[in-house]
Structure formats: structure tokens, C-alpha cells
């Protein structure tokens, strides 16, 4: 099971998006991840996270259902398709596409980890990966420091 290393407790380290308003502080897609869980064949992935709006942390769990193309689909602030694209024991990088109720599309990158900020080298890789996804460097947010929600 390739996905065994995905399971467990994680924190969001960095988020990038081509629509910055969605992920800036208090943005609806600034997700502070806490836990990932897969069922046996990982056809379902459960993601538990907080969103912080008006200094209120609200905890949410969504279940992503694996699609034929390998992405997971779930509903949160619209329609989402996400997938892990890179995983090590320390970090997982997800790409995600959100289409909100107004039909606006946002492409995102989430980096989750074990409470450690990105090294300069990891940050550099993230900048390159963001560019490949047409996301400018200034839209990369290191969100670990702003995560004040319960562990």
C-alpha cells in the first residue's frame, strides 16, 4: 500500500494558489490539516482540518472518493479534486482544484508535514512546482506560524 505513509497526524506547512484570496489569512481554503486516514485500498481518503474565520477555529472532516483518474473528489466550499503528488515520511504535497459555487476555479498546492517549517531547499522546490502550476511565488504562504487552532 503506497498510501500507508500518508496516514496519521499532519500539519499544513505551506499553501499556494493561483487565486490568492482563497488562501490568505481567514480565506475559505486556508486549511489547517490535522489528520489523514485511508480505507483499506485507499479508495476513500478522510481529511480532518480546521478553518479559522473571525478567530474561530472550526473543525471539519471530509471524505475524498477516488475517481478513475486517481484524484479524490469531495465537497467543501464547492467541488474539490485533490491528489497526493509527492510523499516522504516528513512531507506530503497535494495538488487540488476547487470550483466554488460561483463557478470560479482555483488551483492549489498544499504541503503538509510534521510541524517543521520548510527548509530553504524545500521552499525552492515548492517555488518551482508552483511555477509549473502557474502559481506565482508571492502566492506561497507558509501557514505553520498562523496555525493557532487546537492540535
Swiss-Prot record:
InterPro entries for the chain: Calycin, Lipocalin, Lipocln_cytosolic_FA-bd_dom, OBP-like
Q: Name one GO cellular component term.
A: extracellular space
Name the Pfam families on file: Lipocalin
Cystine pairs annotated here are 38-42, 57-149
Q: What tissues harbor this protein?
A: Expressed in salivary glands, hair and urine.
Question: Superkingdom of this entry's organism?
Answer: Eukaryota
Tell me, in one coarse class, where this protein mainly resides.
Answer: secreted
SUPFAM superfamilies attached to this UniProt entry: Lipocalins
Entry keywords, A to Z: Allergen, Disulfide bond, Secreted
Q: Which GO terms describe its molecular function?
A: odorant binding; small molecule binding
Where does it reside? Secreted
What the protein does comes down to: May act as a pheromone.
Q: Which family is this sequence assigned to? A: Belongs to the calycin superfamily. Lipocalin family.
Q: What is this protein called?
A: Odorant-binding protein
Native organism is Phodopus sungorus (Striped hairy-footed hamster)
Amino acid at each position: 500500500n503506497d498510501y500507508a505513509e500518508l496516514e496519521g497526524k499532519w500539519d499544513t506547512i505551506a499553501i499556494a494558489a493561483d487565486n490568492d484570496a482563497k488562501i490568505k489569512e481567514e480565506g475559505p481554503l486556508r486549511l489547517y490539516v490535522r489528520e489523514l486516514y485511508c480505507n483499506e485500498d485507499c479508495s476513500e481518503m478522510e481529511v480532518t482540518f480546521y478553518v479559522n474565520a473571525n478567530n474561530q477555529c472550526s473543525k471539519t472532516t471530509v471524505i475524498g472518493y477516488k475517481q478513475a483518474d486517481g484524484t479524490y473528489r469531495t465537497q467543501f466550499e464547492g467541488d474539490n479534486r485533490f491528489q497526493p503528488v509527492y510523499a516522504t515520511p516528513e512531507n506530503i504535497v497535494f495538488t487540488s482544484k476547487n470550483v466554488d459555487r460561483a463557478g470560479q476555479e482555483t488551483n492549489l498546492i498544499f504541503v503538509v508535514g510534521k510541524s517543521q517549517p520548510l527548509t530553504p531547499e524545500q521552499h525552492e522546490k515548492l517555488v518551482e512546482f508552483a511555477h509549473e502550476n502557474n502559481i506565482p511565488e508571492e502566492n506561497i504562504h507558509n501557514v505553520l506560524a498562523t496555525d493557532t487552532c487546537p492540535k
